[in-house]
Amino acid sequence: MRFNVPLFPLLLQYRLQIALTTKTYFQPDEFWQALEPAHELVYGYGYLTWEWKEGLRSIAHPMVFAIVYWVSDLLRLGDAGVIYGPKVLQALFAATADYSVYKFAQKYYGDEISQLTLMCTVTSAFNYFVSIRTFSNSLEMTLLICALNFWPLDKTAGQVNMLNYSIALVLAAIACVLRPTNILIWSYLGVALIVRQRSFKIVTLAGAIGTIILSLNALVDILYYQRLTFPLYNFLKFNIVESLSSFYGVNRQVYYIVEALPQLLTVYVPFFFHGIYISRSSTLAQACIFVVFVYSLISHKEVRFIFPLLPIFHIFAAISLCRLRILSRPKLKWTFLALLSLLNVPLALYASTTHQRGVVDVTSYIRTTPSIESVGFLMPCHSTPWMSHMHRPDITAWFLTCEPPRGLSHSELATYRDEADQFYDDPELFLRMHFPAVTGNQTEVARFRYDWPSHLVVFGALEELLTSYVGDAYVECKRFFNSHVHEDPRRRGDVVVFCKQND
């Protein structure tokens, strides 16, 4: 796969512009499972969530951003390198995915469908919003579509090109290391290839490359954790055997069909369903259906779990668009496509620049305000980025945790409440039990889990209650708009910073 010089720089410039202007928050894993471990690894401070203490996560994905931090530190780029370095790298990954899906569609479906695929990809609101974020799913998407460019699909005639096949296997194995569930699509494609080719060589090569990549990853993880541990095994045990992923939410079985796909595809969703129906006999379409079906059997579901398939979904949408009679007339074609694409613009811009921006803005405020000595977040857990954005080794910071239950009976699991739950069940009781008196003697502090910090951060939904509880001990010193509406009542309103008054 050779880069088209005019196209790739344009795509990179486009994704860079999005990455550097995105100011909002989507889901915690963008920070807490990627940038925070990387920041802690390089700078030696921060917070590692329970997954890292239990060895559920491979350091492979955070290591990518740790390299960015190391280079930034070497070049003395300061805060700018810490904040913008990962964004630049992720924009490169996103642009590579854009270019790769274009070349893949061109290779297998022709110029018209490849152009329509590229249109869907660059105008997708969800792609605009998520592809430049540092989720492992985002890099998984890039690796998947890059690997497919080298994979021998059912339209490939003759013998398998073993060099291309080897490249595909390496990329696929790395994707599976980053996200173990990526093995679903590759297992389907692999079995289909074996059935079609009936070659022992392709099986042994897959086994050899898979073993090498897994062994290297195991070595890196052992060096990181300083103990013999296998995150892939721990991950599967937690999510499948113990089924504790359901602690983070349970969705109905049709979630991916009726909720996730419309979120991913927005205006392109009817064309996707039509296109995948047209292509239902192809291995790629069947692989996508298989992956969505298996994911639907797992109780905990999230839209970003199938996000890596979005480039492929755009191909199926393009296949449908290509069949529309209205597109046979040039003037109507471009008018229709332009209107269709423009429908995504308001959603993409609002999600990237406005909705949930306060929780990111407040970390910039903390980073750039030297007078802040300590800060506490009375919010649902992981509501903001952490030291990857605050980058302050000189302050004491805490937040309410939400670690899942481990080693409890089924009856205990049903009634388990994490720390954040306990706080929101009865905020005043929690504050009395875990904090000293607001204006109390400092000798009392040791008896309590928390001390009152120099600054408190809350959502507007809690503002009235907190003001009533702390009285004149704290005053509002900064406010950041966060959202117009929010599905979680605990997160509604502005992000408000309270400053402690001197005694």
What would you call each of these model-derived segments?
Residues 27-29, 126-139, 303-306:
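Short acidic/glycine- and proline-prone juxtamembrane loop motifs at membrane-interface regions
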Residues 84-109:
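Transmembrane-helix motifs of polytopic, lipid-linked glycan transferases
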Residues 193, 258-285, 292-295:
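Hydrophobic, aromatic-rich transmembrane alpha-helices
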Residues 149-172, 181-214, 315, 327:
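Perimembrane helix-loop-helix junctions
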Residues 33-41, 53-77, 92, 138, ...:
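Short hydrophobic/aromatic helix or loop-helix immediately within or flanking a transmembrane segment
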Residues 330-455, 460-461, 481, 492-496:
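Membrane-embedded, lumen/periplasm-facing catalytic core of multi-pass transferases
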Residues 8-12, 211, 215, 282-289, ...:
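Signature aromatic-anchored transmembrane alpha helix within multi-pass, membrane-resident enzymes
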Residues 16, 20, 117-119, 125-131, ...:
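Membrane-interface alpha helices of multi-pass inner-membrane proteins
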